[in-house]
């Protein structure tokens, strides 16, 4: 069918600035943490790991040393359900699905029965897709896995894991699930009525645009109303790196709020000082800002912004 202006889309990594960063800015505004604070002060699972001294600023600038990606979902897969390698650099008789450049996955595999169920229950509340529910313990195990991943050097390295940790910090400080915190502080009062994590709890499936035709981790199902990015999916759909669904109109409200120094429709949500800091601070080793990407004024080809974008963006 023809798309409608109120259709919801999976925002993917735009979740980072449309959701997680808003929550981080709000808590910073309230004096709940400092940028040079160590993230382990707010996430006990990181104490005693090589992440213990990583600061919140380093997470926001993507200079934490944490790898760009980690396949958390592999812990849920039954290794006895397939033969040979799960991944291949080239397609063969049992590896037809391409998921990246020179990377193909096994065609048939099963999940560990103790971690994945077909129906919802108190023990299996984390819905990944239709008829796919993860054990409640898996969300916490992801934080443990992040703690065990070896740190790399502290150069600029864009990482979804940085924002997964920031989401965990938001929840530990606010004592609320981040989706509910955002609803309370921003989305509901700003009348962003077409913005939500876990959109199928509020909207009909027909109101949500399908993301992919067949997802290999969801057993070839059409993905509609469930977050596509696997790390967010295996967090139960609410994550710091992905998971938010919205419309262009609602997304515009967030960035109008930021452009206007924390005010939207006559109401103040963030101080101008906090907005100025997060919008203008720039890394000393990359073009990145505090959570935001910024223009590369020295190389317009590599810049993520249009050439017409002003340098002060």
Q: Which residues does each predicted region cover?
A:
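Short active-site loop at a secondary-structure junction
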Residues: 2-61, 149-162, 239-242
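Short, surface-exposed loop or secondary-structure junction motifs
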Residues: 52-312
